[in-house]
């Protein structure tokens, strides 16, 4: 048990009485597989059918068998980024745990529902959000609305890892509609409000993109935290390490700070 909303409201009021701000964790790249949206999405005829990234098995393969995944993307947590669902007869994308299916932000109804939820919390009096992996919400699609690797001629996309899967981050991080989605979120949720703060967890974002996204003129996010420095002792994966050099750490942190010095 995590308490009641009455407990939360009492905590929020007490925090504000002591001039403390309450910033909520916000996870909208994905939901739980137990969420009502996802459970409804398992039915192809439900209005929520396109709220997640559902794809059929690769042509010529038996659904649910090894190698039948729509493409060879790997999950951040290991294994395939695709999980077969027997009820729907298709696979859903999960960049993280199979318990965390990715929302389809290309669907305007998804965005509308997310913004509605965010407004509910803001109206309750919270002071902003820490946005989990928010830079992964826009995926790169081809001209036919397909994700990379969905056709046989693209089986070799990306460098293969030890498990036989490719890194999905080049296709899911800082996608082509990220700025559009963040600016829309700003308009729909935060426009006209004062005294709030937003910070985004930003895998795959360069210092230059950090400067753009946090520029007040672009009306996206207030702050980001990056990960360039996390991998300076890694080569390809966190399990493949290289000697740590403090100069590399200084250079990485300096580049991040220099980009937003103004």
Question: For each predicted feature, which ranges?
Answer:
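Conserved nucleotide-binding/hydrolysis micro-motifs of P-loop NTPases
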Residues: 135-136, 252
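Hydrophobic residues within beta-strands of alpha/beta enzymes
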Residues: 129-131
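Noncatalytic carbohydrate-binding groove/subsite architecture in carbohydrate-active enzymes
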Residues: 194, 202-262
């Amino acid at each position: 048990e995590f308490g009641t909303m009455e407990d939360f409201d009492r905590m929020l009021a007490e925090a504000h009485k002591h001039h403390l701000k309450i910033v909520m964790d916000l996870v909208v790249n994905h939901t739980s597989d137990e969420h009502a949206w996802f459970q409804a999405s398992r039915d192809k005829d439900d209005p929520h059918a396109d709220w997640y990234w559902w794809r059929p098995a690769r042509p010529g393969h038996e659904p649910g068998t090894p190698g039948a995944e729509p493409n060879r993307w790997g999950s951040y947590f290991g294994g395939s980024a695709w999980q077969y669902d027997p009820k729907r007869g298709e696979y859903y994308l999960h960049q993280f745990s199979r318990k965390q299916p990715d929302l389809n932000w290309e669907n305007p109804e998804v965005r509308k529902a997310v913004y509605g939820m965010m407004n509910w919390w803001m109206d309750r009096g919270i002071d902003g959000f820490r946005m989990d992996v928010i830079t992964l919400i826009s995926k790169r699609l081809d001209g036919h609305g397909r994700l990379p690797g969905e056709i046989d001629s693209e089986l070799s996309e990306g460098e293969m890892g030890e498990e036989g899967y490719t890194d999905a981050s080049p296709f899911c991080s800082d996608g082509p509609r990220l700025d559009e989605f963040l600016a829309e979120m700003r308009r729909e949720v935060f426009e006209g409000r004062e005294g709030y703060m937003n910070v985004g967890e930003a895998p795959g974002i360069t210092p230059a993109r950090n400067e753009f996204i946090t520029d007040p003129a672009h009306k996206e996010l207030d702050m980001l935290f990056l990960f360039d420095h996390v991998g300076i002792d890694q080569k390809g994966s966190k399990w493949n390490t290289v000697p740590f050099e403090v100069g590399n750490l200084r250079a990485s942190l300096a580049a991040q700070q220099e980009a937003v010095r103004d």
